[in-house]
């Protein structure tokens, strides 16, 4: 029993070590390998659109056969030309050249906890970093496919703001060419991180107009600014898509380096994932779209879609649209927005345990209003659910402690003959009605819960910068003073004293080292996870002490 229990504890230590040092290797890979898919393209390939306001805005737009033309110089758009839009949850800037969202900040999510007035910036196209949401009209008559460059839109004003009491805000960008009038409309709603981009096409020319809507996310290979290094980990940074054939497929930067992906799909979505936040383009459900990943001529990574061809007769009007989400990974919101989009909150292979844990945490938090106390009450609830199992385990361990003198006598009797010693131990266990595996049950039960809670704390945006009390101001990062890990190590030491001492000296030495090893590992774990483990240990100590004393009292009474 002691050997198996030691193996289990060492295994948990190894798992802990892997989670701290190997997260990027295990979690950063695509869930499914991507392949180059040859399809009959229902629409032109997704174009390389220009870098934006601080770069030479080259056309670099491929023709209908997917070949890229040589870049052409077009007017440079400066910061003063950007169109600024502010709602209660979004603060963004639109580049009039092409109508791309070149900058986007999230006012309700501070960049750092010690600078609450500096919002987290999701999109940025200022030179040092490239990350933006692009859309346009390509194809036969699309203004974004012109050899002379993308359209430069005009607006009635340079600044727009959602006023108090106003629930909707429309920002219209206008452009005319060859008798065709275009309006690119951005529609914002109070409290929402999703916005609708609609193209209104008024064909006043004397010939039919034909084009395709495209929408894409473009990003360079820079690091994730939302990923904390305080835990010693890095979360997944890369693209993802959802189709009816392949729900939730990750496409990493390495996958895109290996080759482009092209698939014609119905509806779905394309997204770019990072720690706590996600951006996604969502086309109309009924459209057949060409989804594509690729690397552009500047080395940026692109995931996007091109919609079906749209034809507008002379004198007629038409519109086409798509939805952009740019904000936190809020599961409830994402689930309502598009099927499968909530899967971007990736809880790993134990998602079926992690999701109920998060659901419980949310409901507890709605009552207590503090995520730290929510973790404590969740731990108490879990311990209560598994108490019958734990009680049986502690009873087995108490009986093991009671027969410790007999085990010592067997050790003296058989010396170094391990085979005879093992046989004698099994006979003793059978005689005393002891389950040699009984003491392993608490560890087996805790491991999947421990791992699942790890994903929940690290992936759920609700935990970002969530304070507890005293020195714990952020449950999603390590304890800045390492107080909780030290307390955790102390509780492990106390818990170890309640367990029977292994008869083998080497096993005993290994067991004594476990609190020190675990304390070292937990130094870099999120404070919320260490809090869970501390509370779990305290409750385990209380349960074990109570059950052990109860059994000892019953044994003494029977002996009397």
Swiss-Prot record:
Name of the protein: Membrane protein insertase YidC
Q: Where is this region: Disordered?
A: 43-72
A single Gene Ontology CC term: plasma membrane
Protein species of origin: Pseudomonas fluorescens (strain SBW25)
Sorted keywords for this record are: Cell inner membrane, Cell membrane, Chaperone, Membrane, Protein transport, Transmembrane, Transmembrane helix, Transport
The UniProt entry's sequence similarity note says: Belongs to the OXA1/ALB3/YidC family. Type 1 subfamily.
Q: One Pfam family, short name please?
A: YidC_periplas
Q: Name the job this protein performs.
A: Required for the insertion and/or proper folding and/or complex formation of integral membrane proteins into the membrane. Involved in integration of membrane proteins that insert both dependently and independently of the Sec translocase complex, as well as at least some lipoproteins. Aids folding of multispanning membrane proteins.
Q: Which Gene Ontology MF annotations are present?
A: membrane insertase activity
HAMAP family in the record: YidC_type1
Q: What is its main location?
A: membrane
Keyword Ribonucleoprotein among record annotations? no
Q: What biological-process terms (Gene Ontology) are attached?
A: protein insertion into membrane; protein transport
The UniProt transmembrane annotation reads: 7-27, 367-387, 437-457, 468-488, 515-535
Topology of this chain in the membrane: Multi-pass membrane protein
Subunit field text: Interacts with the Sec translocase complex via SecD. Specifically interacts with transmembrane segments of nascent integral membrane proteins during membrane integration.
Tell me which CDD domains the record gives: 5TM_YidC_Alb3 (cd20070), EcYidC-like_peri (cd19961)
Signal sequence annotation:
none
Source superkingdom? Bacteria
Q: Where in the cell is it found?
A: Cell inner membrane
Q: Does the record carry Mitochondrion as a key word?
A: no
């Amino acid at each position: 029993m002691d050997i198996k229990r030691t193996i289990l504890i060492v295994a948990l230590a190894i798992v802990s070590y892997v989670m701290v040092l190997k997260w990027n290797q295990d979690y950063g890979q695509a869930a499914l390998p991507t392949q180059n898919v040859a399809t009959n393209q229902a629409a032109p390939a997704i174009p390389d659109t220009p870098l934006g306001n601080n770069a030479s805005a080259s056309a670099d737009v491929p023709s209908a056969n997917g070949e890229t033309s040589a870049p052409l110089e077009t007017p440079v758009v400066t910061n003063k030309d950007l169109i600024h839009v502010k709602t209660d949850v979004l603060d963004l800037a639109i580049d009039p050249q092409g109508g791309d969202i070149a900058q986007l900040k999230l006012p309700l999510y501070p960049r750092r906890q010690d600078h609450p007035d500096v919002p987290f910036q999701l999109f940025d196209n200022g030179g040092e970093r490239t990350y933006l949401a692009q859309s346009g009209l390509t194809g036969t008559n699309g203004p974004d496919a012109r050899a002379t460059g993308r359209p430069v839109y005009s607006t009635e004003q340079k600044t727009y703001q959602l006023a108090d009491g106003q629930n909707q805000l429309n920002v219209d960008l206008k452009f005319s060419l060859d008798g065709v009038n275009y309006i690119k409309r951005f529609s914002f709603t109070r409290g929402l991180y999703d916005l609708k981009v609609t193209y209104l096409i008024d064909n006043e020319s004397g010939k039919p107009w034909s084009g395709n809507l495209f929408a894409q996310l473009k990003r360079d290979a820079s690091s994730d600014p939302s990923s904390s290094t305080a835990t010693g980990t890095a979360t997944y940074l890369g693209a993802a898509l959802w189709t009816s054939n392949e729900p939730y497929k990750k496409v990493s930067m390495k996958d895109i380096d290996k080759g482009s992906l092209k698939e014609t799909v119905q509806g779905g979505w394309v997204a770019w994932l990072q720690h706590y936040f996600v951006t996604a383009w969502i086309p109309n459900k009924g459209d057949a779209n060409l989804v594509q990943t690729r690397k552009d001529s500047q080395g940026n990574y692109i995931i996007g879609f091109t919609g079906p061809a749209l034809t507008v007769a002379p004198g007629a009007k038409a519109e086409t649209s798509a939805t952009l989400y740019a904000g936190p990974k809020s599961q409830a919101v994402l689930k309502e927005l598009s099927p499968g989009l909530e899967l971007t909150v990736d809880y790993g292979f134990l998602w079926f345990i992690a999701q109920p844990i998060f659901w419980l945490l949310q409901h507890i938090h709605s009552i207590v209003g503090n995520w730290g106390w929510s973790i404590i009450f969740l731990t108490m609830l879990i311990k209560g659910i598994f108490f019958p199992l734990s009680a049986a385990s502690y009873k087995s361990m108490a009986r093991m402690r009671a027969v410790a003198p007999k085990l010592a006598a067997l050790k003296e009797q058989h010396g170094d003959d391990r085979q005879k010693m093992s046989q004698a131990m099994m006979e003793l266990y059978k005689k005393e009605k002891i389950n040699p595996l009984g003491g392993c049950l608490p560890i087996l039960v805790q491991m999947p819960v421990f791992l699942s809670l790890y994903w929940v704390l690290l992936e759920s945006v609700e935990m970002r910068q969530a304070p507890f009390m005293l020195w714990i101001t952020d449950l999603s990062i390590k304890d800045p003073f390492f107080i909780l890990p030290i307390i955790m190590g102390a509780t492990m030491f106390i818990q170890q004293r309640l367990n029977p001492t292994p008869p083998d000296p080497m096993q005993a030495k290994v067991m004594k080292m476990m609190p020190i090893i675990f304390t070292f590992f937990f130094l870099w774990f999120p404070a919320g996870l260490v809090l869970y483990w501390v509370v779990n240990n305290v409750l385990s100590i209380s349960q074990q002490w109570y059950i052990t004393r109860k059994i000892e009292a019953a044994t003494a009474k029977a002996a009397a």
